[in-house]
Amino acid sequence: MHIPNPDQARVERTKILGYLLNQEHPDGQSKARFFKQCGFRRSQWRRLANALRNQARRSEVTTVRESSHGTRYVVEGAIETPTGNRLEVRTVWIVEQNQSEPGPRLVTAYPLSSTDR
């Protein structure tokens, strides 16, 4: 099973720049350091956004969770990095109840450790 409407998956600029590539963010700083080591840069934030979208299109959903906010989909699979490596990551997407825009929205992304697999 794939996320619903994967071709309409949304990765917001603020999610990438304000969180996943922000070394000052209290929750995102370790992710930002990791993604930076893999070659992703704030100046080319769309590279990470596109890599995460592609991962969601190609990879299978591993978990589905319903909440009062909507349905969350956990996806595990590889992304291609600017350094040419393949990196196994977990992404979380949400289809919000009563959302005005189509497609799932990225909630978070982080590297999978060997114990996660």
Per-range role (PLM):
Residues M1-G77:
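Compact soluble domain cores
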Residues A51-R105, L112:
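Functional cores of ribonucleases/endoribonucleases
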Residues S113-R117:
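Low-complexity, intrinsically disordered terminal/linker segments enriched in charged
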